[in-house]
Amino acid sequence: PKVIRIGYQKFNTLNILKGTGNLEKALAPLGIKVEWHEFLGGGQLAEALAAGAIDFGHAADGIGVFQQASGKGLVYLAAESPYPGGVGFLVPKDSPYQSVRDLKGKRVATGRGYNTQYTLIRALEAAGLQYEDVEPVYIVTASDTVAAFQAGSVAAVGLWDPFLAGAQVATNSRVLFDGKGLTANRTYHFAKPEYARANQDVLKVVFAELQKTNGWSQ
């Protein structure tokens, strides 16, 4: 049987769809099996997609921008609703920093190619600064990011929901800035162009099931 290899991250619509088993049922009449591959972040997922290790996946809009800029040849198929407040940068509650300008020359935790990095670049540009004006500390997982924050080894950390909301509850922190006015922070679904062209019937079923799941999860 043919297989669709889907990359997903936790706490996302694809992850919920995986849990329901509905996609497997919907694709069975087409003789398609589903293989699920979990990734820690959208950056790694997009790299796997570009390398041909998976066929279909999702990531935040910032990651898609980086991938397109690098000429990796991914095609956007659909986008979920904007969620600019779902990505942001935290500082300690008693921190003297009041805006992104105050991070000049400071160590800031973000993921390489993540929506947090894209948001940081946009925030710095909006403040008349460049990415080179901060010292980025690249961290892969949300838990390591929170650990760096708690250790005080960075001035600010970039996180995305549900980790952003969770960290605000678990740590003595406040949001210095989020994606509002800087990035839509949509979740995009994309594939390799050749896969999308050859498998429109399969992708139609995938999106029908995603739409049902999205309606249910909201």
Residue ranges of each PLM-predicted region?
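Short, glycine-/small- and polar/acidic-enriched structural segments
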Residues: P1-Y131, P136-V140, A155-D161, L176, ...
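Pocket-lining segment of extracytoplasmic ligand-binding domains
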Residues: G62, P136-V137, A142-Q218
